[in-house]
């Protein structure tokens, strides 16, 4: 394979025999070079490097630039814009040695100092005792909710028993198996010889 430099990028051309309809290698290799420029000439500022060209048979195939080249071009363009606006200083290339990150806030936002002794939320209340009695922890307890519901029902006219009726809710024992028909086949009709598994 023959390799030729094309403005800083390698161009590979296959040296094949003459094929019908194929352009000669010398014509295809020099087609992209403007007259008067050498192959190793550097790029001017703002001039794009040509894409890498590869000849496959009678065709010239351009390869897309790599992602690293695209990212570098994007970074260089962003630096140039910031330099023109005067926002790019000499301190941007030096990493921060203190280990702390500085945070930039958008317009209208202020930073909260989140020290443990400072409340992030303030509630309007006349007394702190009332606040602590209703919201003693982050979770509402079931007893507190139950008392509030009972108080509201009493105000609405419903009279609830003060003693819960848990004792009255015992389950009724089931009937003996011998007195009823077999549940598996209904054939026994009280015969004790059939047992349930």
UniProtKB/Swiss-Prot annotation:
Transmembrane segments: none annotated. Residues 1-77, 117-142 are annotated as: Disordered. The modification Phosphoserine is found at residues 14, 125, 127. Pfam families: FAM219A. It comes from the Eukaryota. InterPro entries: FAM219. Keywords: Phosphoprotein. Belongs to the FAM219 family. This is Protein FAM219B. The gene is Fam219b.
